[in-house]
Every structure is written in C-alpha cells, then in structure tokens.
C-alpha cells in the first residue's frame, strides 16, 4: 500500500485526483490556520503517483491500537529524516518496530499508527487517537524507553517536525497491510 500527503482546502476535500478512489482517506485540520492536510492510501505506487503529489510514500508498518475501529479525533504527524539519509530512515523504522511499538501498543485510545517512507528516505509517522491526552501518554512512554543495545543514538536524532492536529474525517481501510 502507498500514500500521498497534500495540503487541501478542507471545504473541498471530496475532490480526488488520480486513478480511481483511494482505499482510505484521513483529513486533518491545519495546526496554524485555515486549510488542512489530506492523507490518501492507495493500492499501489502507480495509483498514488497519478495524483500528482510531490512525494509518494510506501506504507511500511501499521499498528492497530486498542481503540481500533473507533473514530479518531486527534492525529500526531511526525516528520523524520528530512535530509533523506537512508541509515537514519532505517534506524527510525527499526526503533519503531522493535522498541516503540511494543512500548505503546497497550495504550488505551490509540486507534492506528501508519509508518510511511518515501523513495528518498523521508519517514512520516501518522498516529491516530481518540483523544489529545493519548498522544501525550504515547510521547511520555516513548521518552521513557531505553535504547536497545543495537541502536545507534547518533542515527536517532529525533523528529524534524511534530504536528498535533484534529482529525476532521477518517475513512481507514478495514485491513491495512504494509
């Protein structure tokens, strides 16, 4: 599965460009004014590319939380590795799968987490939750985890940007697979 992320006029979010309808869509409010962000999930890279989006992401991991199936109200969008270093992207994905995911999986209120990676090694993590406080608990939990013995702290430089925003609408596929 693949994804596109683009800025949108939230009043006109029904318009989709590309080859057919996306498998799923999440529309997020802007953190700093009018407008918003639309995340579309596509069955393949070709469908995603036909949207004309600046960047196409591959969905590399999906975590269904304890609140899976409930309507998400808040999203945390974490942008990692803006310089496109493949080693940093690999390290971030490894940390996510082997350290962070096990630590946060049991947190109440987490609906779903999507990990996206572009061909130029940018990583975006979209966490969907039923409340703002859930994202705060996730952050506290992540910061309390110790690095694994095989993690290199030099490659884990943190997020480039973190946006905590309201979810305006979310239509997630029932069986997202990476």
Locations of regions flagged by a protein language model:
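Short S/T/G/P-rich N-terminal loop/turn motif that feeds into the first structured element of a domain
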Residues: 1-123, 130-145, 151-178
């Amino acid at each position: 599965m693949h994804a596109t992320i683009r800025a949108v006029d939230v009043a006109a979010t029904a318009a989709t460009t590309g080859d057919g309808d996306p498998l799923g869509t999440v529309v997020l409010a802007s953190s700093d004014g009018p407008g918003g962000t639309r995340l579309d999930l596509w069955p393949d890279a070709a469908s995603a590319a036909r949207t004309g989006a600046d960047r196409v992401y591959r969905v590399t991991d999906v975590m269904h939380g304890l609140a899976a199936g409930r309507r998400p109200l808040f999203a945390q969008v974490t942008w990692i590795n803006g310089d496109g270093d493949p080693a940093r992207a690999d390290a971030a994905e490894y940390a996510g799968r082997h350290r962070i995911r096990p630590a946060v999986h049991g947190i109440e209120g987490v609906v779903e987490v999507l990990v996206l990676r572009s061909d130029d090694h940018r990583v975006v993590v979209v966490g969907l939750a039923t409340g703002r406080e859930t994202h705060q608990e996730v952050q506290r939990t992540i910061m309390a985890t110790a690095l694994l013995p095989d993690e290199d702290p030099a490659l884990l430089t943190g997020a480039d940007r973190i946006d905590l925003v309201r979810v305006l609408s979310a239509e997630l596929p029932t069986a997202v697979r990476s």
